Amino acid sequence: MPEAVIVSTARSPIGRAGKGSLVSMRPDDLAAQMVRAALDKVPALDPREIDDLMLGCGQPGGEAGFNIARVVAVELGYDFLPGVTVNRYCSSSLQTTRMAFHAIKAGEGSAFISAGVETVSRFPMGTSDGWPDSHNPLFAEAEARTAATAGGAGSWHDPREDDLLPDVYIAMGQTAENVALYTGISREDQDRWGVRSQNRAEEAINSGFFAREISPVTLPDGTVVSTDDGPRAGTTYEKISQLQPVFRPDGTVTAGNACPLNDGAAAVVVMSDAKAQELGLTPLARIVATGVSGLSPEIMGLGPIEAVKKALGYAKMSVSDIDLFEINEAFAVQVLGSARELGIDEDKLNVSGGAIALGHPFGMTGARITA
């Protein structure tokens, strides 16, 4: 059976939404630059040999609509290249890599582009979830329950225990507060993780790590952007601990222990081991196994627990076999909750910082973590 390997990656700098370095970039243009950058690193690969361009996007509407994956392919001059846009929200471009992995394992292709993009700055031009009056009234009671707990709550339990529907439209900040209540993870622990993320990112920047990882972006006016907007040098617990809760008056989630809103794109070239050998390419990594899981949407941040268990099970491995872990830092509480339940050594986790410092463009993040 063929193996799936990663032979090239590219990721843009990450901009702050609405006020950062990439506000002028359309999502299709930004994604096209990163796909081009990833392909430029493997000139032996003829674009006509690519089987599909799979692009993850958390809000595939507005400027990111019209099957943006196909738009990107055509923009690059690859009218012959199919494209599919995938929405699994914050893990969209992990899912596209998973799809490439599965296609290669099934023998249905030997070279794929897995990409991801999100430009929150461009959301005023339209989003897939932005239409008014589109919520299913079946969930009205659940939404009212969420609105009530946003004013303050002392605990969380699964509404299914009361034969009630969970809130599928719940804001992510509310889910983070629920995770904090459910796990008992303190504000101090969350703040210290947020500081760690910033400090680790600062160390990685100073060592040149991100300079090697980032592919510069050329803006419409010709300006070149090559660094992330988010990392804050000299972040301390004393500073972070003074911030006020964002989502609940009695909450623990703040701007210092959660990710900001962002713009960014990334791309990964995945191919079979035989194709890489044929082209004389040295793989950067081999994809061994993947896993997905579901749980109450009201505590969505603990999803990595069962997903990691599944992937390790398929790979016939254990947590102790893994040298480095990446869990997306949408919120510190979800990283800590997942890592502690899995028994992950924090010294192996998000070693160069994570989304709290770097940023979290939803559809991009999976490919950024991979890169």
Q: Where do the PLM segments sit?
A:
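N-terminal extracellular/periplasmic Venus flytrap/periplasmic-binding protein-like
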Residues: 11-13, 24-33, 44, 152, ...
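Conserved active-site "lid/cap" helical segment
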Residues: 1-72, 76, 175-187, 204, ...
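Flexible glycine-/small-residue-enriched beta->alpha junction loops
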Residues: 111-178
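Active-site-proximal alpha-helical scaffold in enzymes
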Residues: 73, 84, 88-118, 126, ...
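Beta-strand segments within the central parallel beta-sheet cores of soluble alpha/beta enzyme folds
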Residues: 47-56, 84-88, 112-116, 189-196, ...
